[in-house]
Amino acid sequence: MVCFSKYSGITLDMRLILIDWLIEVHYEYECIIDTLCLAIILVDEFVDRIDKIDRKYFQCIGICCMNIATKILEPEHIGSENCNFISASQYTTDVIISYEKNILQTLDFHLVRKTILDSLWSKIKDFSRQKKNMGIFFTIVSMTSDKYKCFPCEKIADGIIKLVDLIDNYPIDSIDYTDEINTDTIMRYLWSQLTICTNKKLDGYTDLIKNLEIDFEFMKKLTSDIILKPKIVLFPSKNLELYTPLRHCFQYNTEDISNITVVKNLGEGTYGTVDLVTLNASKAAIKTQKELNEEISPDMVNEIVFLRIMDHPNIIKLYGYHLGSQTKLVLEPMESSLRRFIIDDTWNNLNKTLGITNNIFSDNQKIFYIKQLLEGLKYLHENRIVHGDLTCSNILISKSKLKICDFGSSKIIHPKNKLNYKTSKCSLWYRAIELLLEQNYDEKIDVWSVACICGFILGDKLFDGDNESEIIENIFSHLGTPDPIIFESKTSINIPTKKYKFVGFEKLEEKYPDITSIIYRMLSYDSKMRISASQTLEEFNKFNSD
């Protein structure tokens, strides 16, 4: 065993039973398969990093890792109370919260991983549904032992595809397949795990086969027909593809936090508060989760996770975090949000603070800020990160610097795959049309949001409304009613029956004709035709901002 050999009390069979149970949990809570894969990885790495495990808490570790994975990838997380229920109240809610924080601190919030499934998705894009399901099946089979960590993700994905092709064309009476599997290390590993799982009575494994519409009797026949040679030895190894570079940040202790002096409140919301503080004689911004002694919220988990892997001059920096009775994020301080800078009553004072004379927000300054916003967005999308909630309140300014903040709604997007619209929490005025019409989405929702922010910066709010239906009607009244082919699936939102023609934004066109033409391309109803962040930046770089 790779991770578990140092724990005499926890066997590989115990691990298999845990994974089988997590498969059941994943179906009960209708999680995507990616969530299950991430949870398994987190279990293995946590076990690998700690010195001692009490076997009676092994299941607690499993359900906590599943809960963490849902916070990263699902529209709704399982929650500590449901974790207590799922585990038949073996562990109190307080114990579950404590273990979850221990896992997060031990892993240092390093939760964005390249998985076998990531490598597989792009390779099986054009497969039949049956072959795709078989690929997913063997991905989970590969992770029923912790030896999957001995192989690069790409290699396992390639082995899965070879095996799926082999089974798809399998003639029962042929012995050639036995030789082919035995001469390929990864296929042999996959087959050995398939044989183990098929010959044990595993409820989760049975559910997996049933839900993926795989013929169990056929698989049983295959495992009896194909005989493996004596076991190969897999030496313990850490698969470096599971790790991504992290920015350094501190884990502040209680004593550090007690030395904070609050200078002023910068804002508050449903998440909690943000304060400007001095910490160790330096200024910082501290975001504090509102609830006391509660599990860390999905937004806080996401924010720490994504800020740990990002390093760009137009992205806010995370100095560190503290997981106490309240979760605290220690962030780079900035003077103002873009929203406050543009529309609040403190306009004159802020202009003075930011070094802008005569209360004039010049056209060059507007272009300069927009370019910085696009530089940050380009960086996000190049790293497969969807921000998910870009608004004027989530853009910060200090003097000539602009930085993107608030990554609580951010997601990793896989190439050629779209995210479930239910995972989006984008603010109403900045919400892309596909989200309003309950369509799945990709990184282009951020481009739509930036178009709306550009409107604010240039002096013309693009869309408003008190609910989804009002916003949709407002969008249609400016951009025209879209072709129904673009949004043909059903939606629970009331769509305007009136047919609108394109009229655009007359005031904006009159003052900024060239920029407005770019904004229209950023607001394309069809996300495939919508201009990318990189292309938008290229267009804005043609304008002078000196």
Swiss-Prot record:
Domain of life: Viruses
Catalytic residues as annotated in Swiss-Prot or TrEMBL: D389 (proton acceptor)
Annotated protein name in UniProt: Putative serine/threonine-protein kinase L268
Stored PROSITE patterns: PROTEIN_KINASE_DOM (PS50011), PROTEIN_KINASE_TYR (PS00109)
Start and end residues of each Cyclin N-terminal domain: 1-112
Reactions performed catalytically: L-seryl-[protein] + ATP = O-phospho-L-seryl-[protein] + ADP + H(+); L-threonyl-[protein] + ATP = O-phospho-L-threonyl-[protein] + ADP + H(+)
InterPro entries: Cyclin-like_dom, Cyclin-like_sf, Cyclin_N, Kinase-like_dom_sf, MAP_kinase, Prot_kinase_dom, Tyr_kinase_AS
Keyword entries, A-Z: ATP-binding, Kinase, Nucleotide-binding, Serine/threonine-protein kinase, Transferase
Enzyme superclass (EC): transferase
Gene3D superfamilies in UniProt: Cyclin-like, Phosphorylase Kinase, domain 1, Transferase(Phosphotransferase) domain 1
Record-annotated Protein kinase domain positions: 260-544
A Pfam family of this chain: Cyclin_N
Enzyme Commission identifier(s): 2.7.11.1
Protein family membership: Belongs to the protein kinase superfamily. Ser/Thr protein kinase family.
Residues reported in the UniProt entry to bind ATP: L266, G267, E268, G269, T270, Y271, G272, T273, V274, K287
PANTHER family: MITOGEN-ACTIVATED PROTEIN KINASE
Database matches in SUPFAM superfamilies: Cyclin-like (SSF47954), Protein kinase-like (PK-like) (SSF56112)
Molecular function as annotated in GO: ATP binding; protein serine kinase activity; protein serine/threonine kinase activity
